[in-house]
Amino acid sequence: MLIGEKSIEENKKKMLERKEVYKQYGYDQDASRNFILEKSLPLRLPILEIGTGKGHMTALLAKQGVKVITVDNSLADQEFARLNVAAEKVLDSVRFALFDAAQLPYPDQGFGTVVSVNAFHHFEKPFAVLGEMIRVCREKIVIADFNQEGFEIIRKLHRDEGHEHEEKCGDFSLVGQYLKGYDFAVKKHDGCHQVVYVGERKK
């Protein structure tokens, strides 16, 4: 799909304006994503991302000089993501896939690193998705979501804009124990409004 430069620039302007809104509420999106990336390194190849969203983490991963397959069930979100990834000049490094993350079409242990950022609270069946992440992961899983302070900021911003932030019922605090149950060594990191679980499959 060809993307025009005008569309890329218009979207980038809106994205930068949105980042400033978040900063006014005390949430630095770039610092948050860089915190997650730092805890994710070194990345094991190939890389699968679960939950493309608007493509911000997708682009950051691809900017590390690696190829990324990113999965989402929303075509609309992936169209926005293409614009954001294109703005970062890494579109050729990203393959977009439209699938239900609870039923991935990939082979067992087919990916060196499986990443999911700020998507867990949106999943209808979060532990079915986590189970699929475990199945297709050969070495490392990185799964991050907002910490309590982060959620409070996001909820307030959305309320101030006249709507509620969508959150499903998954208990993110169980993720670490769940990974350990599948023989992963797990580290938990809390900072920059994020909780990040990094699980490495034991040899």
Predicted regions and their residues:
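C-terminal alpha-helical "lid/dimerization" subdomain adjacent to the S-adenosyl-L-methionine
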Residues: 19-26, 57-59, 71, 142-198
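A short His-aromatic
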Residues: 119-122
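Conserved class I S-adenosyl-L-methionine
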Residues: 1-42, 44-53
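Structural signature of beta-strand start/N-cap positions in the alpha/beta core
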Residues: 46, 67, 95, 110-112
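A short glycine-rich, Lys/Arg-flanked "PGG" loop and its adjoining helix->strand segment in the class I
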Residues: 127-141
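A conserved beta-strand element that flanks and buttresses the S-adenosyl-L-methionine
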Residues: 115
